[in-house]
């Protein structure tokens, strides 16, 4: 039984948001790099750094907060498809999150992308997570 790196990344970000922690370290894999890139492009995180410590590749995410109370830009981050229950969708059935305010991150045959990109390119895939 292997580790679910996507669930580990989501849980680390969620826990850091609850504790108002600015940086999060997650194991760097191709999937976590692509998810971090999407979160950065959509404005949910400030930036991310691909760091190599000893023999481990680590991805350092700088989370984004607003105001003096440090309200997080990421309200909810939830895993959809899990290793025990994969959930796939074609481009017509990809769910809209909060009427388009949030995003769904998908793994497609053309890489990891947001729901808007997948609808535009008319391709479906595995629904990885919701972000809003």
Swiss-Prot record:
What Pfam families does this protein map onto? Ribosomal_S8
Question: What cellular component terms from Gene Ontology apply here?
Answer: chloroplast; ribonucleoprotein complex; ribosome
Keyword terms of this UniProt record: Chloroplast, Plastid, Ribonucleoprotein, Ribosomal protein, RNA-binding, rRNA-binding
Q: Which superkingdom?
A: Eukaryota
Disulphide bonds in the chain: none
The processes (GO biological process) annotated in the record are: translation
Q: Which InterPro entries match?
A: Ribosomal_uS8 (IPR000630), Ribosomal_uS8_CS (IPR047863), Ribosomal_uS8_sf (IPR035987)
The listed locations are:
Plastid, Chloroplast
Would the keyword Hydrolase turn up in this protein's UniProt record? Answer: no
Tell me, what is one Gene Ontology molecular-function annotation carried by this entry? structural constituent of ribosome
Q: What quaternary structure, including any partners, is listed in this protein's UniProt entry?
A: Part of the 30S ribosomal subunit.
Family of the protein in this entry: Belongs to the universal ribosomal protein uS8 family.
Q: Which PANTHER family match?
A: 40S RIBOSOMAL PROTEIN S15A (PTHR11758)
Say what the protein does: One of the primary rRNA binding proteins, it binds directly to 16S rRNA central domain where it helps coordinate assembly of the platform of the 30S subunit.
Protein's name according to its UniProt entry: Small ribosomal subunit protein uS8c
Q: Which gene encodes it?
A: rps8
């Amino acid at each position: 039984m292997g580790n679910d790196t996507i669930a580990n990344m989501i849980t680390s970000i969620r826990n850091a948001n609850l504790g108002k922690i600015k940086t999060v370290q997650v194991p760097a894999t191709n999937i976590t790099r692509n998810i971090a890139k999407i979160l950065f492009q959509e404005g949910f995180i400030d930036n991310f750094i691909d760091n190599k410590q000893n023999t481990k590749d680590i991805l350092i995410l700088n989370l984004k907060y607003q105001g003096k109370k440090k309200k997080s830009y990421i309200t909810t981050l939830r895993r959809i498809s899990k290793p025990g229950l994969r959930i796939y969708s074609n481009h017509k059935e990809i769910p809209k999150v909060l009427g388009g305010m949030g995003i769904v991150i998908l793994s497609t045959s053309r890489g990891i992308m947001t729901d808007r990109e997948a609808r535009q390119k008319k391709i479906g895939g595995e629904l990885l997570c919701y972000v809003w």
